């Protein structure tokens, strides 16, 4: 119940900030919400305890963010160490994690957080060049200011070079001494992450489908914890691709979610099944694996998908 309330809160924040939002209802998914506004795209995992995010989920989240040039975020309320603090950025497997209030301030008040948590306490990164200018302007030597702050000369020089984060206490002292903001905001909405996009298929059916799609000239990015199994891509073609043995209630539910996500990330969707009759679920075609043998390249696959969608639409309105 607490998690459900959290997801609804995050969704309300996003919509209140003018984002288009798709929400997933898939246990264990690497993201719960995907949202877009102008040139910003966010993949968000909402979880009460941020330490429950697995490395596998995090890697998938980073893969999606890298592929779609989006920012991944984890929104939560606590960690194993205790409650998350408002206005503080935490990290889980290289992904920013924060409270919903912090997200609210960033999206609706244009107030980006500056404080981040690391082992040992709370820190900020400061504008080192401005610090040096202010120190010289106010007539402090390196030794004098270091002594006043209770830090070493080496640490102060590192602050000025931008080579070392500053503890929150020291940052507050600096801003009180110079009466000027020195902390640099953390742009949580434009986070850059590294991710391995070369992940192998897991099942014999996935391997078979991957091989066939590659023969058609499509590149593939495998995703483990999402409603789709892969993203198929070729030039400006992007297909959220599901793979299943047969059509089940789970397949239909996943296809519906793929349709929702596709609308936000401007991508088509397709499900390739071991055995099925061709049909469309929420504008996402379900096609039998053997259909891949009938097309020569990616363009023909898109034509097949579009033709199927058109036929289904005509049947509905005939």
UniProtKB/Swiss-Prot annotation:
InterPro entries membership: Arc_TR_HTH, Cro/C1-type_HTH, Lambda_DNA-bd_dom_sf
UniProt key word Kinase: no
Residue stretches making up the HTH cro/C1-type domain: 131-189
One GO MF term: DNA binding
SMART domains: HTH_XRE
Record-linked SUPFAM superfamilies: lambda repressor-like DNA-binding domains
Superkingdom of the organism of origin: Archaea
Entries under Gene3D superfamilies matching the protein: lambda repressor-like DNA-binding domains
Keywords of the record: DNA-binding, Transcription, Transcription regulation
Listed NCBIfam families: PRK04140.1
UniProt name for this protein: Putative HTH-type transcriptional regulatory protein TK0539
Annotated organism of origin: Thermococcus kodakarensis (strain ATCC BAA-918 / JCM 12380 / KOD1)
């Amino acid at each position: 119940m607490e998690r459900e309330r959290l997801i609804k809160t995050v969704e309300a924040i996003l919509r209140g900030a003018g984002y288009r939002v798709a929400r997933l209802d898939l246990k264990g998914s690497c993201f719960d919400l995907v949202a877009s506004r102008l040139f910003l795209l966010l993949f968000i995992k909402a979880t009460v305890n941020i330490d429950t995010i697995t490395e596998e989920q995090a890697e998938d989240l980073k893969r999606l963010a890298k592929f779609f040039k989006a920012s991944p975020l984890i929104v939560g309320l606590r960690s194993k160490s205790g409650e998350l603090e408002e206005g503080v950025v935490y990290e889980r497997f290289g992904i920013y994690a924060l409270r919903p209030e912090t997200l609210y301030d960033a999206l609706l008040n244009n107030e980006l957080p500056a404080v981040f948590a690391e082992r040992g306490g709370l820190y900020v990164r400061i504008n080192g060049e401005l610090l040096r200018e202010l120190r010289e302007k106010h007539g402090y030597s390196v030794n004098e200011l270091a002594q006043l702050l209770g830090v070493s000369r080496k640490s102060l020089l590192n602050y000025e070079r931008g080579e070392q984060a500053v503890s929150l206490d020291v940052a507050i002292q600096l801003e009180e001494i110079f009466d000027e903001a020195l902390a640099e905001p953390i742009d949580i909405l434009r986070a850059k992450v590294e991710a391995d996009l070369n992940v192998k298929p897991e099942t014999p059916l996935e391997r078979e489908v991957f091989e066939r799609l590659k023969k058609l000239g499509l590149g593939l990015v495998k995703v483990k914890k999402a409603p789709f199994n892969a993203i198929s891509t070729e030039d400006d073609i992007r297909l959220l691709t599901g793979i299943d043995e047969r059509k089940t209630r789970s397949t239909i539910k996943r296809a519906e979610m793929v349709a929702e996500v596709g609308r936000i990330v401007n991508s088509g969707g397709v499900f390739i099944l071991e055995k099925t009759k061709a049909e469309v679920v929420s504008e996402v075609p379900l096609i039998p694996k053997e259909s891949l043998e009938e097309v020569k390249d990616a363009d023909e696959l898109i034509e097949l998908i579009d033709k199927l969608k058109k036929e289904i639409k005509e049947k509905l309105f005939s």
